[in-house]
Amino acid sequence: GLDFMNNGSSNIFINGPISKKHFLKKNYPGITEFVYDKAKQKIAKNPVMLIFNKKLSVSPLTTHIALNNVKKNIVKDRIIENVNIINNFYKKILKIKPNIAVLGLNPHCENNSKDNEEKKAIIPAINQLKKKRIKVHGPFSADTLFIKNNLKKFNVVIGMYHDQVITPFKTIFEFDASNITLGLPFLRISVDHGPNEIMMGKNKSN
């Protein structure tokens, strides 16, 4: 399928549930990273993962990397690129100028360090994006952003790591979403879950 995409034969790549432990080698933390690596051409320096729902979408900035590697990957340029690509997707494909919320990394978006991630990377990125008239806001604390009244204000929430946004998203929407990989010459669209091996072949999945 990816060979077909790399030949320019299509601009949309769709896959069903894939078992990471059976399919991927150890050097790929997720299918998103695998597809990004195998694409011959890239628009973004890093894969952009968008869990899309028409009511609210989320994007983990650092995709599937281990938690102990998150901090060093939160840099201004990566945040700017992530927001730009998602904003362009909404404008060009969905014809919507999205309201985008960006979460902080630390509890309540603060810690005692003068050089924390909010001050060093997140706030400068947001300020630069606002100069381009992109509707981006934050940083917000993850513990309160996902309450009902706040959800009505935004189209997309960008978090700093996977579980920061995927956990509340699936608590609200369960599996009513598509996993879209952006930053490539083609759109890769998938279900937002892997295969349920316990129920496989029993015709019991919803």
Language-model features: locations:
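Anion-binding alpha/beta catalytic cores of soluble intermediary-metabolism enzymes, centered on
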Residues: G1-S205
